[in-house]
Design a protein with these regions (language model features):
Chain B
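An interfacial alpha-helical scaffold signature
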Residues: 1-258
């Protein structure tokens, strides 16, 4: 039972981390003078990536901290990041 | 401070303005601004990026950003996702004018990108292999067995050298096989969808398994089912996989519509 739960949480976390990775690192970048990017975004990115790094560390050591638990409780958000796992 | 800037989530092919009434980041009302057949999904905001030192707040921002993109995929049959925290300033005109100007200037590239992503979602595929099983197979190969046979009856020094040679050979053959597996998976999946990228993996979750390759694919429902079917056939032969998605097609729009 516990193993099943942990397995489900891991599946969910993979979806979350994949989503965060894409959101922070990818997507169209507008190269226009009137877009807020130059001064502010590097700082923001550093801040967010620090948060992401802490998630990776938590996952690495199997710690399901506060950062992730609220996400797994929200059905709407779960739907948005549905993850499928197929194994042996 | 007035909300005279625009936070832009993504671009859809709609062509007319719509008060979409979806709640975006911090509950802001999301609507569209259209030009040249394309519509940007936006909310009014201040001229400053969304940031916080609270991880929970950051999580909320990211989820809210993606919720709008997910809704857009369902409503408009696709979305061109913009980088998180894309905010258009007012400058000497209005932020709306600046956005329309950008849409107009990038129409051709938006058309090209839309044709590629319409009706498709992005999926992350992690394929793992059983390292121990592979080493065992290689260790039992004729080439390694010959080296081991040669060791028999040899003096300590020569035996040690041959043992080292066997280890090096196991490593070489192992890596060749891993690279071969990787190429085969890539080629086979590419037969289903040409929109395929190897993604550097920064995240290792199942430490008991070894990651063979981390892929991002752009696929419609039929294609992803075909890929899943193909991967399922490989299960039990020393491979396993995890598939996450669908996501907005983040990996397939970069540097194309900027």
């Amino acid at each position: 039972m516990l193993l099943t739960l942990l397995s489900k949480m891991k599946q969910h976390n993979i979806g979350i981390v994949e989503l965060i990775d894409r959101t922070l690192n990818k997507g169209v970048i507008l190269n226009a003078d009137l877009v807020i990017t130059v001064a502010d975004v590097p700082l923001l990115a550093a801040n967010l990536k620090l948060a992401l790094a802490s998630v990776e560390t938590m996952l690495k050591y199997g710690v399901m901290g506060d950062w992730l638990v609220p996400v797994s409780l929200n059905k709407e958000e779960n739907k948005a990041i549905e993850t499928v796992e197929i194994k042996n | 401070m007035p909300d005279d800037a625009l936070y832009v989530y993504g671009i859809v092919k709609l062509g007319f303005d719509l008060d979409w009434r979806e709640a975006g980041i911090e509950g802001k009302n999301v609507y569209t601004i259209s030009e040249c057949g394309f519509s940007a999904l936006v909310h009014d905001c201040e001229e400053k990026p969304y940031m916080s030192e609270d991880p929970n707040k950051i999580k909320e921002l990211i989820i809210a950003h993606n919720k709008i993109l997910d809704r857009a995929i369902n409503h408009f049959d696709g979305v061109i996702p913009l980088h998180f925290n894309t905010i258009i300033k007012k400058g000497g005109n209005s932020s709306q004018y600046n956005l329309k100007k950008w849409l107009n200037n990038n129409k051709e590239r938006l058309e090209k990108t839309w044709d590629k992503i319409k009706g498709r979602g992005e999926y992350g595929i992690r394929i793992y292999y059983d390292k121990e099983k592979l080493i065992e197979e290689v260790s039992n190969s004729e080439e390694i067995k010959d080296i081991e046979t040669n060791r028999e009856g040899k003096g300590a020094g020569l035996s040690y050298l041959l043992q080292s040679k066997a280890k090096t050979k196991i490593n070489e053959i192992g890596w060749d096989k891993v690279n071969g597996f990787k190429k085969k998976f890539y080629d086979d999946i590419k037969k289903v969808t040409a929109n395929l990228k190897i993604t550097p993996s920064r995240i290792f979750i199942d430490e008991e398994k070894d990651l063979l390759v981390n892929l991002s694919v752009l696929a419609d429902n039929q294609q992803i089912n075909k890929i899943k079917g193909f991967l399922e056939q490989k299960i039990g032969n020393g491979f396993s996989f995890q598939l996450a998605g669908p996501f907005a097609p983040y990996s397939f729009v970069e540097n194309e519509t900027a």
